[in-house]
Amino acid sequence: MMRLGITTDSRVQNGYGRYGADTYKKLAEHGYFGTDFNLSNTETVPYTLSREDAEAFLLREREMARAAGVTIWQVHGPWRWAPRDFLPEDRAERMEKMKWALWACSVLECKNYVIHPLMPYGIEDIGSGNEESTWEINRTFMRELLAEAKRYGITICFENMPMRKFSIATPEAILRFVQEMDDENFRICLDTGHVAVFWDLDLAEETRRLGKYIRVMHVHDNRNGLDLHQLPFDGVIDWPSFAKALKDIGFDGVFSLECGAPGKLPDALFERAARLCADIAADIVRDL
């Protein structure tokens, strides 16, 4: 069976943080091989710590995961909502944080670093006349970031987005960008729920389109054209069809959830719901 993973991001209803130092032990107990370590919020720990204290924090996380038999399979790099990439100084600040997170990724001994495209004209540039500028700003930014990633031996995983009027959002657009970058350290994070936001896209078909370029995944479901990060089977995705597509392309990575049991549940209910989440994921990939 394909290995399972799950995010540590509390903003997508992940309540594993309640377990404190035993978080990774709980992940292992529930059947997870790996985790998606969240470094998206640059206004919180470890970004707010000194370099020395940040390294100590990251090393503790790494060792707790290792002791529990859990692999930090991927790291989610900086992301802010609403996007603020409009000015050169905004993008310079992003670059500084992105490079810091790459260093953090290296301390965690993680080789997969997930990031979003820059949105210098906001989330709706299609039809504005700014599409090519959006692409060129991203090319310039990502080339510099890629050079830093290669220094650490880390692969940048460029994520498809749920913005229907943004020019670097669909799997097709992400694939074109990655192919233009033309580097084995620049690959794709397939976000299943983001594909589901587009009414006219079929996840299985898009998975086959991306094929060998898929390095990591964000797995969740959506409905009503919204990015809700719901559990599989709670939205519009055909999960058996998606599983077949993964088998067809020979994907051998981690089936990593970007959803989870509601964090507000009392402990006893959360335990049961969290196990159910893992069971749902395991059922989807049981033949892979």
Regions found by a protein language model. Name each.
Residues 1-33, 66, 95, 99, ...:
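Histidine-acidic metal/acid-base catalytic patches
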Residues 1-10, 73-84, 120-126:
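N-terminal small/glycine-rich loop or linker at the start of catalytic domains
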Residues 10-12, 39-41, 78-81, 117-121, ...:
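Active-site-proximal loop/turn and secondary-structure-junction residues that shape catalytic pockets
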Residues 18-24, 64-67, 82-187, 197:
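Active-site acidic/histidine proton-transfer and metal-coordination neighborhood
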Residues 36-37, 74, 114-115, 158, ...:
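Hydrophobic residues in well-ordered beta-strands that form the structural core
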Residues 38-61:
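Glycine-rich, proline-tolerant flexible connector loops at the mouths of alpha/beta enzymes
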Residues 43-48, 81-86, 121-128, 197-198, ...:
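A short acidic, helix-capping loop that chelates divalent metal ions and anchors anionic groups
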Residues 55-58, 138-141, 274:
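Well-ordered, non-membrane alpha-helical segments in soluble/globular domains
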